[in-house]
From Swiss-Prot:
CDD domains in alphabetical order: Hb-beta-like
Record's protein name: Hemoglobin subunit beta
Domain Globin: 2-146
CC annotations in GO: blood microparticle; haptoglobin-hemoglobin complex; hemoglobin complex
Entry annotated with the keyword Glycoprotein: no
Residues forming coiled coils: none
Tissue-level expression: Red blood cells.
Residues binding heme b, per UniProt: 63, 92
Pfam families reported for this sequence: Globin
SUPFAM superfamilies per UniProt: Globin-like
Family, per entry: Belongs to the globin family.
Length: 146
């Protein structure tokens, strides 16, 4: 995938302001609340019975941070995202059997979370760059499925 200098700047500039623990936890919690069928992959996380339970679940928060920390590797390696996520793609396909559509859903949720956190700083140009990034990451994670 080709990135313009402006796209790279918009992505890395915003990433530098992201609170990974807060945004990661919120993104995963929102995924589990908005798309409840995704909860089946997190049975070991305990109580996910209500939005309040999901939002307050420390395992959701911790894994959300882990997911977004990993996403940060895409930001650092914009020109080699497929390679960056090769092992994670294998893990999610072969061992965890995660539906690859869930990667797209989580990417869309992340864009919503960033918009909520950054308001006017999350301009349409910034959103377009991030939407492109989450699509590329979702595709890289789904690569092992093809």
């Amino acid at each position: 995938v080709q990135w313009t200098a402006e796209e790279k700047q918009l992505i890395t500039g915003l990433w530098g302001k992201v609170n990974v623990a807060e945004c990661g936890g919120e993104a995963l919690a929102r995924l589990l609340i908005v798309y409840p069928w995704t909860q089946r992959f997190f049975a070991s996380f305990g109580n996910l019975s209500s939005p309040t339970a999901v939002l307050g679940n420390p395992k959701v928060q911790a894994h959300g941070k882990k997911v977004l920390t990993s996403f940060g590797e895409a930001v650092k390696n914009l020109d080699s995202i497929k390679g960056t996520f090769a092992q994670l793609s294998e893990l999610h396909c072969d061992k965890l059997h995660v539906d690859p559509e869930n990667f797209r859903l989580l990417g869309d949720i992340l864009v919503v979370v960033l918009a909520a956190h950054f308001g006017k700083d999350f301009t349409p140009d910034c959103q377009a760059a991030w939407q492109k990034l989450v699509r590329v990451v979702a595709h890289a994670l789904a690569r092992k499925y093809h």
